[in-house]
Amino acid sequence: MKFSSLKSIFARIFVSLAGLTVLAIPGLAKPNRTPQTAIQPGQPWLDTNGVHINAHGFSVLDFGGRTYWYGAHKMEGKTEDEKNEAGISCYVSDDLMNWQDQGLVLSVFAPDAHPDLASAFILDRPKVIYNEATNKFLLYFKLYPPKEKGGKSGKDYAWVGVATSNSPTGPFDYKGYFLGNHSEFGTGDFAIFTDTDGAVYHIAVRKPDKALVYGRLSKQGLKPVGEYKVLDGVTIGTEAPAFFRRGNKVYLLGSGTSGWKPNPARLFVADRFTGPYQELPNPCRGINPHNNLGPDKTFGGQCTYVYPIAGRQDAWIAMFDINKPEDPINAGYIWLPVDFESDQPVIRWRDQWDLSVFSKQ
């Protein structure tokens, strides 16, 4: 067996004493629950092994006819004030409802983990894209240095970590980090957006003034090239950015800044990705019956991604985390379809739903 194959196996199989988590070879466990036939926002979401999905601050990727869900893997018994991420986890699905655990695709506890990863205070909000120029999968994530090096708050500095893989299920090889906005402070919450001309952009909250800025990434996708610019028309303090395109319009869904507490969703529209943007009304409608929170609290969630569904017409899913800072491993998820009324996005609460709400192309 080649060393590279052994390395791949050991990267997937390890015991994390810090998280009291045992990861097994993906695919060996047999499903032990009834397949899910609907998406139930705000309800516990179990994988095909009957275990709560552990992939927070997440994004999704379509590739090869399957969908991949990437998120931060939270550790049992840890709060958001502690180092609580074991790495980036991946789940795969053929129907967006039933998800098979693929294990950690990037681990901070792997024997050969880079010191940047092993010592990181925070490693979250992963985004994965496929780079056609290199035939590699690129994983971007928010990477904070050790808390004692993070300034007064422990979070004053934030990097953008980058890793690559030949497969969507990893393992991913850490390639280093870059400083968003070319600033010593770096940037916070971010999105990765591919424009119609193929250009890929890193969009992030600039530290310390919280303006939303964008910079173009290199062809290989490992670092930004050129200067960052402010997205004109986007309110200062807009975080958790998620972009999607409908026709000739680009929409930005985000939130305000209120720590772990939910706040009203923010929505903007522009004729092109680089702006200028115009603010639209809060798109949320209805009440989440599980916590009695409505539009003024985004159903208790915070936006993390807007997913365009392949093979469906005008089909997007607005995706949210339900933050639970005292017990993040058990934090939840909200997925809701995006409707359009008078060309404005509307995100209406539904207790459960399936893909039949969208028209096939």
Language-model segments: residues:
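N-terminal secretory signal peptides that target proteins for export/translocation
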Residues: 1-11
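Intrinsically disordered, low-complexity regions enriched in serine, threonine, proline
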Residues: 9, 27-30
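Bacterial N-terminal signal peptides
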Residues: 12-24
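Carbohydrate-active catalytic/glycan-binding domains of CAZyme proteins
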Residues: 30-361
